[in-house]
From Swiss-Prot:
GO cellular component terms listed in the entry, alphabetical order: chloroplast stroma; chloroplast thylakoid membrane
Gene: PETH
Domain of life: Eukaryota
Compositionally biased intervals (Polar residues): 11-22
Physiological role: May play a key role in regulating the relative amounts of cyclic and non-cyclic electron flow to meet the demands of the plant for ATP and reducing power.
Organism listed in the record: Mesembryanthemum crystallinum (Common ice plant)
Protein name per its UniProtKB record: Ferredoxin--NADP reductase, chloroplastic
Matches recorded under PANTHER family: PTHR43314
Top-level enzyme category: oxidoreductase
Names of the cofactor(s): FAD
Reactions this protein catalyses: 2 reduced [2Fe-2S]-[ferredoxin] + NADP(+) + H(+) = 2 oxidized [2Fe-2S]-[ferredoxin] + NADPH
Bilayer topology annotation: Peripheral membrane protein
Residues annotated as domain FAD-binding FR-type: 86-208
Protein backbone atom coordinates (compact mmCIF):
# COMPACT_ATOMS: atom_id res chain seq x y z
CA UNK A 1 0.00 0.00 0.00
CA UNK A 2 1.34 3.41 -0.96
CA UNK A 3 1.45 6.00 1.84
CA UNK A 4 0.35 9.57 1.31
CA UNK A 5 2.77 12.04 2.91
CA UNK A 6 2.07 15.64 3.92
CA UNK A 7 5.04 17.78 4.84
CA UNK A 8 5.81 21.26 6.15
CA UNK A 9 9.21 22.63 5.23
CA UNK A 10 10.93 25.63 6.87
CA UNK A 11 14.29 27.22 6.17
CA UNK A 12 15.96 29.87 8.38
CA UNK A 13 16.79 32.12 5.47
CA UNK A 14 15.58 32.87 1.96
CA UNK A 15 18.94 34.20 0.90
CA UNK A 16 20.07 32.51 -2.30
CA UNK A 17 23.09 30.26 -2.37
CA UNK A 18 25.54 30.19 -5.29
CA UNK A 19 25.26 27.11 -7.51
CA UNK A 20 28.81 26.14 -6.70
CA UNK A 21 27.89 25.46 -3.10
CA UNK A 22 24.83 23.29 -3.90
CA UNK A 23 26.77 20.14 -4.22
CA UNK A 24 25.36 17.89 -1.55
CA UNK A 25 22.52 17.35 0.89
CA UNK A 26 22.44 15.49 4.20
CA UNK A 27 19.22 14.20 5.78
CA UNK A 28 18.82 12.94 9.35
CA UNK A 29 15.52 11.93 10.90
CA UNK A 30 13.96 10.98 14.21
CA UNK A 31 10.60 9.21 14.48
CA UNK A 32 8.14 10.50 17.13
CA UNK A 33 4.81 8.87 17.90
CA UNK A 34 2.09 11.38 18.72
CA UNK A 35 -1.54 10.28 19.13
CA UNK A 36 -0.60 7.07 17.35
CA UNK A 37 0.26 8.99 14.18
CA UNK A 38 3.91 8.57 13.15
CA UNK A 39 5.63 11.92 12.72
CA UNK A 40 8.99 12.37 11.09
CA UNK A 41 11.18 15.42 11.79
CA UNK A 42 14.08 15.78 9.42
CA UNK A 43 16.95 18.23 9.46
CA UNK A 44 18.00 18.93 5.92
CA UNK A 45 21.29 20.51 4.98
CA UNK A 46 21.40 21.91 1.46
CA UNK A 47 24.37 23.99 0.40
CA UNK A 48 25.22 24.87 4.00
CA UNK A 49 21.68 25.93 4.96
CA UNK A 50 19.79 23.84 7.50
CA UNK A 51 16.03 23.45 7.42
CA UNK A 52 13.44 21.23 9.03
CA UNK A 53 10.89 18.94 7.35
CA UNK A 54 7.97 17.64 9.36
CA UNK A 55 6.16 14.80 7.61
CA UNK A 56 3.07 12.81 8.52
CA UNK A 57 2.60 9.38 6.96
CA UNK A 58 -0.95 8.08 6.69
CA UNK A 59 -2.54 4.88 5.43
CA UNK A 60 -4.35 6.69 2.64
CA UNK A 61 -3.55 4.99 -0.63
CA UNK A 62 -1.98 7.27 -3.18
CA UNK A 63 -3.68 7.25 -6.57
CA UNK A 64 -1.88 5.17 -9.18
CA UNK A 65 -1.82 6.57 -12.68
CA UNK A 66 -3.23 4.15 -15.24
CA UNK A 67 -0.95 3.61 -18.20
CA UNK A 68 -2.94 3.57 -21.41
CA UNK A 69 -1.89 1.27 -24.21
CA UNK A 70 -1.76 2.97 -27.57
CA UNK A 71 -2.27 0.32 -30.22
CA UNK A 72 -0.70 0.55 -33.66
CA UNK A 73 -3.78 -1.13 -35.08
CA UNK A 74 -7.15 0.27 -36.13
CA UNK A 75 -8.74 -0.42 -32.74
CA UNK A 76 -10.63 2.84 -32.25
CA UNK A 77 -14.36 2.20 -32.20
CA UNK A 78 -13.99 -1.54 -32.72
CA UNK A 79 -16.96 -3.53 -31.44
CA UNK A 80 -16.61 -7.04 -30.03
CA UNK A 81 -19.16 -9.57 -28.79
CA UNK A 82 -22.24 -7.55 -29.67
CA UNK A 83 -24.01 -10.87 -30.19
CA UNK A 84 -23.21 -13.74 -27.84
CA UNK A 85 -24.25 -17.43 -27.89
CA UNK A 86 -27.13 -16.78 -25.49
CA UNK A 87 -28.36 -13.86 -27.55
CA UNK A 88 -27.28 -14.46 -31.17
CA UNK A 89 -28.31 -12.76 -34.39
CA UNK A 90 -30.30 -14.63 -37.02
CA UNK A 91 -29.42 -13.70 -40.57
CA UNK A 92 -30.13 -15.24 -43.95
CA UNK A 93 -27.97 -16.81 -46.62
CA UNK A 94 -28.02 -14.63 -49.75
CA UNK A 95 -25.39 -16.42 -51.80
CA UNK A 96 -23.41 -19.67 -51.55
CA UNK A 97 -21.06 -20.72 -54.32
CA UNK A 98 -18.19 -23.18 -54.68
CA UNK A 99 -14.94 -21.40 -55.52
CA UNK A 100 -12.58 -24.37 -56.02
CA UNK A 101 -12.28 -26.47 -59.16
CA UNK A 102 -13.61 -30.00 -59.52
CA UNK A 103 -10.10 -31.47 -59.33
CA UNK A 104 -9.24 -29.62 -56.11
CA UNK A 105 -8.66 -31.78 -53.02
CA UNK A 106 -11.77 -30.68 -51.16
CA UNK A 107 -14.46 -28.08 -51.69
CA UNK A 108 -14.29 -24.47 -50.57
CA UNK A 109 -17.37 -22.26 -50.66
CA UNK A 110 -17.85 -18.50 -50.56
CA UNK A 111 -21.05 -17.48 -48.80
CA UNK A 112 -22.76 -14.17 -48.12
CA UNK A 113 -25.13 -13.64 -45.17
CA UNK A 114 -27.41 -10.70 -44.44
CA UNK A 115 -27.07 -8.90 -41.12
CA UNK A 116 -28.95 -5.68 -41.97
CA UNK A 117 -26.19 -3.56 -40.50
CA UNK A 118 -26.46 -5.20 -37.07
CA UNK A 119 -22.98 -6.78 -37.01
CA UNK A 120 -20.51 -3.88 -37.42
CA UNK A 121 -17.26 -5.73 -38.07
CA UNK A 122 -13.78 -4.62 -39.14
CA UNK A 123 -11.16 -6.13 -41.43
CA UNK A 124 -9.48 -9.01 -39.58
CA UNK A 125 -12.34 -9.87 -37.23
CA UNK A 126 -14.32 -13.12 -37.03
CA UNK A 127 -17.92 -14.20 -36.51
CA UNK A 128 -19.31 -17.27 -34.81
CA UNK A 129 -21.75 -19.65 -36.45
CA UNK A 130 -24.09 -21.93 -34.48
CA UNK A 131 -25.13 -24.81 -36.77
CA UNK A 132 -28.62 -26.25 -36.70
CA UNK A 133 -29.40 -29.41 -34.78
CA UNK A 134 -28.13 -31.09 -31.62
CA UNK A 135 -25.01 -33.04 -30.72
CA UNK A 136 -24.79 -36.67 -29.56
CA UNK A 137 -25.65 -35.56 -26.03
CA UNK A 138 -28.85 -33.90 -27.14
CA UNK A 139 -27.50 -30.38 -26.66
CA UNK A 140 -27.34 -27.57 -29.24
CA UNK A 141 -24.13 -27.52 -31.25
CA UNK A 142 -21.42 -25.17 -30.05
CA UNK A 143 -20.43 -22.24 -32.19
CA UNK A 144 -17.49 -22.29 -34.57
CA UNK A 145 -15.48 -19.18 -35.37
CA UNK A 146 -14.71 -18.17 -38.95
CA UNK A 147 -12.52 -15.33 -40.21
CA UNK A 148 -14.53 -12.78 -42.13
CA UNK A 149 -13.71 -12.72 -45.85
CA UNK A 150 -15.44 -9.46 -46.74
CA UNK A 151 -14.79 -5.77 -46.18
CA UNK A 152 -17.01 -3.94 -43.66
CA UNK A 153 -19.06 -2.60 -46.57
CA UNK A 154 -19.76 -6.22 -47.50
CA UNK A 155 -19.62 -7.80 -50.94
CA UNK A 156 -22.71 -5.85 -51.99
CA UNK A 157 -21.33 -2.52 -50.77
CA UNK A 158 -24.26 -1.67 -48.48
CA UNK A 159 -22.74 -2.56 -45.06
CA UNK A 160 -25.51 -5.12 -44.55
CA UNK A 161 -23.74 -8.40 -45.34
CA UNK A 162 -20.86 -10.54 -44.09
CA UNK A 163 -19.01 -13.15 -46.15
CA UNK A 164 -17.19 -16.33 -45.16
CA UNK A 165 -14.80 -18.65 -46.94
CA UNK A 166 -15.37 -22.23 -45.72
CA UNK A 167 -13.80 -25.56 -46.65
CA UNK A 168 -16.04 -28.60 -46.37
CA UNK A 169 -14.46 -30.95 -43.82
CA UNK A 170 -14.76 -34.66 -44.64
CA UNK A 171 -12.25 -37.24 -43.46
CA UNK A 172 -11.86 -40.91 -42.59
CA UNK A 173 -11.19 -41.71 -38.93
CA UNK A 174 -9.04 -44.49 -37.47
CA UNK A 175 -11.95 -46.92 -37.69
CA UNK A 176 -12.36 -46.34 -41.39
CA UNK A 177 -15.54 -44.33 -40.90
CA UNK A 178 -16.27 -41.21 -42.92
CA UNK A 179 -16.68 -38.19 -40.65
CA UNK A 180 -18.24 -34.91 -41.72
CA UNK A 181 -17.47 -31.66 -39.93
CA UNK A 182 -20.69 -30.42 -38.35
CA UNK A 183 -20.46 -26.70 -39.02
CA UNK A 184 -18.54 -26.71 -42.29
CA UNK A 185 -21.00 -29.10 -43.94
CA UNK A 186 -23.95 -27.17 -42.54
CA UNK A 187 -22.57 -23.98 -44.08
CA UNK A 188 -21.52 -25.44 -47.42
CA UNK A 189 -24.98 -26.98 -47.83
CA UNK A 190 -26.90 -23.76 -47.07
CA UNK A 191 -29.34 -22.61 -49.71
CA UNK A 192 -30.12 -18.94 -50.38
CA UNK A 193 -32.95 -17.89 -48.10
CA UNK A 194 -31.93 -20.25 -45.30
CA UNK A 195 -31.47 -18.87 -41.80
CA UNK A 196 -28.04 -18.80 -40.15
CA UNK A 197 -27.38 -18.02 -36.48
CA UNK A 198 -24.41 -15.69 -35.93
CA UNK A 199 -22.42 -14.29 -32.99
CA UNK A 200 -19.77 -11.61 -32.76
CA UNK A 201 -17.95 -9.85 -34.16
CA UNK A 202 -14.86 -10.96 -32.23
CA UNK A 203 -11.12 -10.47 -32.23
CA UNK A 204 -8.50 -7.70 -32.31
CA UNK A 205 -5.38 -9.75 -33.04
CA UNK A 206 -5.72 -9.48 -36.82
CA UNK A 207 -6.82 -5.85 -37.13
CA UNK A 208 -4.99 -3.83 -39.77
CA UNK A 209 -2.25 -1.37 -38.78
CA UNK A 210 -3.13 2.32 -38.76
CA UNK A 211 -0.06 3.38 -40.72
CA UNK A 212 -1.01 3.81 -44.41
CA UNK A 213 2.68 3.63 -45.32
CA UNK A 214 3.30 0.31 -43.58
CA UNK A 215 4.71 -2.84 -45.12
CA UNK A 216 2.13 -5.59 -44.58
CA UNK A 217 3.27 -9.17 -45.20
CA UNK A 218 0.38 -11.65 -45.34
CA UNK A 219 1.00 -15.40 -45.08
CA UNK A 220 -1.98 -17.64 -45.84
CA UNK A 221 -2.77 -21.26 -46.55
CA UNK A 222 -6.16 -22.28 -47.96
CA UNK A 223 -9.11 -20.57 -46.29
CA UNK A 224 -6.65 -18.58 -44.18
CA UNK A 225 -6.87 -16.13 -47.07
CA UNK A 226 -10.18 -14.81 -45.68
CA UNK A 227 -8.96 -11.84 -43.57
CA UNK A 228 -6.46 -10.81 -46.25
CA UNK A 229 -9.17 -10.55 -48.90
CA UNK A 230 -10.77 -8.04 -46.54
CA UNK A 231 -7.45 -6.20 -46.03
CA UNK A 232 -6.72 -5.97 -49.74
CA UNK A 233 -10.15 -4.72 -50.70
CA UNK A 234 -9.66 -1.82 -48.29
CA UNK A 235 -6.21 -1.09 -49.68
CA UNK A 236 -6.89 -1.30 -53.40
CA UNK A 237 -10.60 -1.39 -54.27
CA UNK A 238 -12.06 1.22 -51.92
CA UNK A 239 -11.78 4.97 -51.43
CA UNK A 240 -11.70 6.41 -47.91
CA UNK A 241 -11.46 10.01 -46.75
CA UNK A 242 -9.20 9.01 -43.85
CA UNK A 243 -7.16 6.18 -45.37
CA UNK A 244 -5.15 5.76 -48.56
CA UNK A 245 -2.68 2.91 -48.66
CA UNK A 246 0.76 4.01 -49.88
CA UNK A 247 2.86 1.20 -48.41
CA UNK A 248 3.72 -2.30 -49.58
CA UNK A 249 1.32 -5.24 -49.34
CA UNK A 250 2.93 -8.62 -49.99
CA UNK A 251 0.75 -11.72 -50.09
CA UNK A 252 2.02 -15.30 -49.98
CA UNK A 253 -0.74 -17.86 -50.56
CA UNK A 254 -0.08 -21.60 -50.26
CA UNK A 255 -2.46 -24.19 -51.74
CA UNK A 256 -2.17 -27.79 -53.04
CA UNK A 257 -3.38 -27.24 -56.64
CA UNK A 258 -4.01 -24.36 -59.04
CA UNK A 259 -7.75 -25.01 -58.83
CA UNK A 260 -7.47 -24.33 -55.07
CA UNK A 261 -6.23 -20.76 -55.53
CA UNK A 262 -8.96 -18.72 -53.87
CA UNK A 263 -9.90 -15.25 -55.20
CA UNK A 264 -7.02 -15.45 -57.69
CA UNK A 265 -8.64 -13.17 -60.27
CA UNK A 266 -9.38 -10.49 -57.67
CA UNK A 267 -5.79 -10.45 -56.47
CA UNK A 268 -4.40 -10.28 -59.98
CA UNK A 269 -6.61 -7.25 -60.71
CA UNK A 270 -5.26 -5.58 -57.58
CA UNK A 271 -1.71 -6.22 -58.69
CA UNK A 272 -2.47 -4.80 -62.12
CA UNK A 273 -4.02 -1.71 -60.52
CA UNK A 274 -1.20 -1.06 -58.04
CA UNK A 275 1.97 -2.84 -59.21
CA UNK A 276 4.21 -0.67 -57.03
CA UNK A 277 2.23 -1.38 -53.87
CA UNK A 278 1.18 -5.02 -54.18
CA UNK A 279 3.30 -8.14 -54.57
CA UNK A 280 1.68 -11.52 -55.05
CA UNK A 281 3.31 -14.94 -54.70
CA UNK A 282 1.54 -18.29 -54.94
CA UNK A 283 2.93 -21.60 -53.67
CA UNK A 284 1.22 -24.61 -55.28
CA UNK A 285 2.65 -27.64 -53.51
CA UNK A 286 1.45 -30.43 -55.83
CA UNK A 287 2.38 -28.67 -59.05
CA UNK A 288 5.44 -26.53 -58.35
CA UNK A 289 8.96 -27.22 -57.10
CA UNK A 290 11.97 -25.09 -56.29
CA UNK A 291 15.40 -25.33 -57.92
CA UNK A 292 16.22 -28.30 -55.66
CA UNK A 293 13.14 -30.21 -56.74
CA UNK A 294 11.40 -29.69 -53.39
CA UNK A 295 7.63 -29.18 -53.23
CA UNK A 296 6.60 -25.54 -53.23
CA UNK A 297 5.05 -24.89 -49.84
CA UNK A 298 4.55 -21.36 -48.57
CA UNK A 299 7.83 -21.43 -46.62
CA UNK A 300 9.62 -22.73 -49.73
CA UNK A 301 8.39 -19.75 -51.72
CA UNK A 302 9.35 -17.37 -48.92
CA UNK A 303 12.85 -18.85 -48.84
CA UNK A 304 13.38 -17.48 -52.36
CA UNK A 305 13.09 -13.98 -50.88
CA UNK A 306 14.59 -14.77 -47.48
CA UNK A 307 17.15 -11.95 -47.26
CA UNK A 308 14.68 -9.36 -48.53
CA UNK A 309 12.04 -10.49 -46.03
CA UNK A 310 14.53 -10.40 -43.18
CA UNK A 311 15.55 -6.83 -44.02
CA UNK A 312 11.87 -5.81 -44.06
CA UNK A 313 11.37 -7.40 -40.64
CA UNK A 314 14.00 -5.09 -39.20
CA UNK A 315 11.83 -2.06 -39.98
CA UNK A 316 9.53 -0.73 -37.27
CA UNK A 317 6.64 -0.30 -39.71
CA UNK A 318 6.58 -3.86 -41.07
CA UNK A 319 3.68 -6.02 -39.92
CA UNK A 320 3.36 -9.77 -40.47
CA UNK A 321 -0.02 -11.52 -40.44
CA UNK A 322 -0.28 -15.31 -40.60
CA UNK A 323 -3.56 -17.19 -41.04
CA UNK A 324 -4.27 -20.80 -41.95
CA UNK A 325 -2.86 -24.20 -41.07
CA UNK A 326 -0.71 -24.30 -37.95
CA UNK A 327 1.87 -26.47 -39.71
CA UNK A 328 3.28 -23.55 -41.68
CA UNK A 329 4.61 -21.85 -38.54
CA UNK A 330 7.54 -24.22 -38.09
CA UNK A 331 8.66 -23.94 -41.69
CA UNK A 332 8.64 -20.15 -41.50
CA UNK A 333 10.51 -20.21 -38.18
CA UNK A 334 13.16 -22.46 -39.72
CA UNK A 335 13.86 -19.87 -42.41
CA UNK A 336 14.08 -17.01 -39.96
CA UNK A 337 16.28 -18.82 -37.44
CA UNK A 338 19.19 -19.06 -39.86
CA UNK A 339 18.72 -15.54 -41.24
CA UNK A 340 18.66 -14.00 -37.78
CA UNK A 341 21.65 -16.06 -36.69
CA UNK A 342 23.74 -14.52 -39.48
CA UNK A 343 23.21 -11.18 -37.76
CA UNK A 344 23.86 -12.62 -34.30
CA UNK A 345 20.18 -12.48 -33.35
CA UNK A 346 18.10 -15.16 -31.67
CA UNK A 347 14.99 -15.45 -33.85
CA UNK A 348 12.61 -16.55 -31.12
CA UNK A 349 13.63 -13.66 -28.86
CA UNK A 350 13.25 -11.29 -31.78
CA UNK A 351 9.82 -12.71 -32.63
CA UNK A 352 8.70 -12.05 -29.06
CA UNK A 353 9.69 -8.41 -29.51
CA UNK A 354 7.75 -8.26 -32.77
CA UNK A 355 4.67 -9.72 -31.08
CA UNK A 356 4.91 -7.21 -28.25
CA UNK A 357 5.09 -4.41 -30.81
CA UNK A 358 2.01 -5.85 -32.61
CA UNK A 359 4.14 -6.59 -35.67
CA UNK A 360 3.77 -10.38 -35.64
CA UNK A 361 0.14 -11.52 -35.66
CA UNK A 362 -0.96 -15.15 -35.90
CA UNK A 363 -4.31 -16.90 -36.26
CA UNK A 364 -3.83 -20.57 -37.08
CA UNK A 365 -5.80 -23.78 -36.63
Amino acid sequence: MAAAVTAAVSFPSTKSTPLSTRTSSVITHEKINFNKVPLYYRNVSVGGKVGTIRAVASDVEAPVAKVEKHSKKMEEGVIVNKYKPKNPYTGRCLLNTKITGDDAPGETWHMVFSHEGEIPYREGQSVGVIPEGIDKNGKPHKLRLYSIASRPLGDFGDSKTVSLCVKRLIYTNDNGEIVKGVCSNFLCDLKPGSEVVLTGPVGKEMLMPKDPNATIIMLATGTGIAPFRSFLWKMFFEKHDDYKFNGLAWLFLGVPTSSSLLYKEEFEKMKEKAPENFRLDFAVSREQTNEKGEKMYIQTRMAQYDRELWELLKKDNTYVYMCGLKGMEKGIDDIMVSLAAEDGIDWFDYKKQLKKAEQWNVEVY
